[in-house]
From Swiss-Prot:
Its main location: secreted. Residues 6-9 are annotated as: [R/K]XCQ motif. It comes from the Eukaryota. The keyword Secreted applies. Has the structural arrangement of an alpha-helix connected to antiparallel beta-sheets by disulfide bonds (CS-alpha/beta). GO terms for cellular component: extracellular region. It is found in: Secreted. This is Potassium channel toxin alpha-KTx 5.5. Disulfide bonds join C3-C21, C8-C26, C12-C28.
Amino acid sequence: AFCNLRRCELSCRSLGLLGKCIGEECKCVPH
């Protein structure tokens, strides 16, 4: 599956984290 950066950012933001696409994976990382 292709990582959608916008969707990744939105889902991570709700956790108070920053969304990053690593390859095809969405990773939530601290700011």
